[in-house]
């Protein structure tokens, strides 16, 4: 029974990776933000870093979440954009 549950969980996880968008665009009044999802999957390697509740939409996602989580991760890794104009493009 444990093997069946583990197999189903793995299937759902892999399906999420297979059907995830390559790039997402988030509308913002000071310029849209293009998010290279596939690139982040490859670099971070752990979906739960952002998708804490599992595959799909991120609970609580919005400006405050993105600034805290995305910018915070970039600062922590010393890699990626951290200034407004680096992400927001008009």
UniProtKB/Swiss-Prot annotation:
Biological-process GO terms, alphabetical: anaerobic respiration
One Pfam family matching this protein: Cytochrom_CIII
SUPFAM superfamilies reported for this sequence: Multiheme cytochromes (SSF48695)
Family annotation (InterPro entries): Cyt_c_III, Cyt_c_III_dom, Cytochrome_c, Multihaem_cyt_sf
Annotated residues for binding of heme 3: 67, 84, 87-88
Keyword Secreted recorded: no
Residue numbers binding heme 2: 40, 70, 73-74
Protein's job: May be involved in anaerobic iron respiration.
Record protein name field: Cytochrome c7
């Amino acid at each position: 029974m444990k093997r069946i549950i583990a197999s189903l969980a793995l299937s759902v996880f892999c399906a999420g990776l297979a059907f995830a968008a390559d790039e997402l665009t988030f509308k913002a009044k000071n310029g849209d933000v293009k998010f290279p999802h596939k690139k982040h999957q490859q670099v971070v390697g752990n979906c739960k870093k952002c998708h804490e509740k599992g595959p799909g939409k991120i609970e609580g996602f919005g400006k405050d979440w993105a600034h805290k989580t995305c910018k915070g991760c970039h600062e922590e890794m010393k890699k990626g954009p951290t200034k407004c104009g680096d992400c927001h493009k008009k």
